[in-house]
Amino acid sequence: MNSIPSIISKHKAYFAAGHTRPLESRLNILRKLKQAVRTHEADLIAALYQDLHKSEQEAYSTEIGIVLEEISFVMKRLRKWSKPKRVKTPLTHLGSKSIIIPEPYGTVLVIAPWNYPLQLALSPLIGAIAAGNTVVLKPSEYTPAVSAILSKLISSVFPTDYVAMAEGGPDVSTALLQQPFDYIFFTGSVAVGKIVMEAAAKQLIPVTLELGGKSPCIVHKDADIQLAAKRIVFGKFTNAGQTCIAPDYLFVHEDIKTKLTEEMKRAIREFYGPQPERNPQYGKIVSERHYQRLLSFLNDGIPLTGGQSDPNHHKIAPTILEQVRDDSPVMQEEIFGPILPLFTYRNIGEVIEKVQSRPKPLALYLFTTNKEIERAVLGNLSFGGGCVNDTLMHVATPYLPFGGVGESGIGSYHGFDSFNTFTHKKSVVKQTNRFDFAFRYPSSKNGLRMIRKILK
């Protein structure tokens, strides 16, 4: 930790020397990063399995492939994004030009979580590098195998004064948060997000906080039940439910509860087999502490399906809980695991009222073909992002900003929004010397009269 101030000092010097700003240099380094991800693909897949038991398909589709696509998307558009932008000038500034110049903040701290240890480390890094910043990357200590490969990958692409890895536990994060970064990007829990924001506020460092919360899923009676079941099971139990935008609890119209739950059971068997907790391709819980926490939630309801566990591999079968009380522990915090509390409803107003009573979630999912129901939910509920008739997929399009609202986060990224997040928009007025307006000066006799005519 004694080296952390030295790392920051070297990064600031590297940035001040202008090494990160030339467009062609940024494109070239992103190209190298993409190639390095491809080169290390097999090692990354093995590491993701070692740390989280992610299957090869899951590892590629939710981690490696997302990163490769993000780099490709950014590289195709970076030249356009980096250009100074002319904007309109009001009559009061006649003869002048107004320009917005995108410029990097400087040295950025990225604190990444353990649940998607590759994607959630490299996706913000891509945006920061594209914008012209240097980056200090703090990976999670809970995924050491991925961190080891990530360290090799980063060092093969970037000089250490450009991108550096700072590995370790909470003590390293605490030390980093005391440094004079120019921007902080954090992905993690609400509780730690508050600590990050408090530390940043002491130095007036701007932040993006990608947090979480209890994301509801609503299935109305007119939904395509079979399709809804498969998409909910996919969204909830991918990565063993350890996804910040996974459905956290489920509202089902009372008329279709039996049909939907039977289809969900069928989908669980289809995806993960008759004993998911024994399936080597089904994800594991990241730590003993988190595993025990999730096991305790099983006491908060009656398993409609699931509930089995494997303590040797920290696995819990996909579980649907019913007869859950609103004030039970499983409904008081983000679950972050393969447990899905189920509630029934009679009219959509009940659901809207219950969701409104909670902090604004990171995601919301609605299954319906009824436009009025869709308008009622989307128009009355605030959430970071979501899907109608699907789950998770809004996070996979680079054309949409991804981020939270309220307690679920501050700021957004992905695609252009990643570049935008790590860019200061410098506003410049270039004034003409060909003429001057005398009325603007305090010595003008008719200045106030002219100003009143113009500014009204």
Swiss-Prot record:
GO molecular function: aldehyde dehydrogenase (NAD+) activity
Keywords on record: NAD, Oxidoreductase
Species per Swiss-Prot/TrEMBL record: Bacillus subtilis (strain 168)
Lineage start: Bacteria, Bacillati, Bacillota, Bacilli, Bacillales
Gene: ywdH
Protein name: Putative aldehyde dehydrogenase YwdH
GO biological-process terms attached to the record: aldehyde metabolic process
PROSITE patterns to which the protein is assigned, alphabetical: ALDEHYDE_DEHYDR_CYS, ALDEHYDE_DEHYDR_GLU
Catalyzed chemical reaction(s): an aldehyde + NAD(+) + H2O = a carboxylate + NADH + 2 H(+)
Pfam family, one: Aldedh
Enzyme Commission number(s) from the entry: 1.2.1.3
Annotated CDD domains: ALDH_YwdH-P39616
